[in-house]
Amino acid sequence: MRWKRGQSSGNTIDARGSRMPGGGRVAVPGGLGLVGVLVFLAVQLLGGGSGYAVPSAFDDGTQAPGGGAIPADQDPERDLRDFSEYVFDSAQRSWTRTFGGYRDAKLYLYRGAVSTGCGNASSAVGPFYCPADQRVYLDLSFFGDMEQQLGAPGDFAWAYVIAHEVGHHVQNLRGTNDDVRRLQREDPGQANPLSVRLELQADCYAGVWAHSVFDQLDDGDVAEAIRASEAVGDDRLQRRATGEVRPDSFTHGSSAQRAKWFRTGQASGEPADCDTFSVDDV
C-alpha cells in the first residue's frame, strides 16, 4: 500500500513505554477482536467478540494510564507504528464521509498487557475493540505473529486487521453491537451464530474501506488481506490448536466466510452490502 506520513489526527495513544499496574495479570476482555483469544483456543474461548467476559479478580475495568510513548529516534517499530496510525486515520476519514453519525475512536498502542474499559487483557488476545471506551487496542508485535505463526504477511494484511477493528466501532455507533448482545441474552443458543455474523460484518466493513483506497494499492495488496482473513478463520485456528474443527463453537466465521465478506465489501464499497444479519446463509 502506498502511503506517506502526514499530520496526525491526534487519535492515537501510544502507551508502549508504560507497564500495566498489577504485573499484567490477564482476564479475557469483553471486547470485539479479530481472532479471539488465541491462547485459550484449546478450551474454545475463541470469542473475543462473544460478549461474555470471563470473571476474574483482576477484571475490574480500570484504565491504564496514558503516555509512555517511545521517542521516534529510539523506536524500532516506528514505521509500523506510523503505518498503523495512517491506516486507522484513513479508515476513520472514510467512515466520516460515509456515515453521518460517525464519531472518532481512539487507537491505543500497548505492549504485553493492558487494562481497558472492557477488562484486562494481554497481547495474546490479538487486536480488539472495546465498546465501553471506544478504543482499538493493538500490540504491534501481532504483526510478526501474523507473518510467522499465521502465514499472513504484508502491510495490507495488517491494514485489514486495523480496518476490521474500526468496523467494530462503526457497529457500536450504529447500535448493532447492542442489538446482538440483546439477542444473545434472549436466546443464548444463538450466541455463537450471532457473534459470527457480527464479525463477518466487520470483515465486510474492512473491505468497504479497502475499496475507498483502491488507488493507493499495489499489486497483491488485496490478496494479502484475503490471505489474512482466511488465516484467522475459526476452522483454521481450531485445526492448528486442537487438530479438529467444531463449527458449533465458531464465533468469528470460517476462513471461507471471512474472505467472502471481505471481498463483498471490497468489491462494492457499499456498507449496505454488509448486512450479514438479513441473509440466511453467511
Tell what function each PLM region has.
Residues 83, 102-104, 123-125, 131-135, ...:
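Extracytoplasmic
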Residues 142-160, 190-196:
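Short pre-active-site segment immediately N-terminal to the catalytic Zn-binding motif
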Residues 95, 138, 156, 160-173, ...:
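Active-site recognition of the HExxH zinc-binding catalytic motif
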Residues 166-181, 213-214:
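Catalytic Zn2+-binding segment of zinc metalloproteases
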Residues 1-70:
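Long amphipathic alpha-helical segments used for membrane anchoring, targeting, substrate engagement
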Residues 233-282:
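Pan-zinc metallopeptidase signature
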Residues 53-57, 113-139:
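Catalytic zinc-binding patch centered on the HExxH motif and its immediate surroundings
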Residues 76-78, 82-102, 107, 193, ...:
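Short helix/loop segments within enzyme catalytic domains
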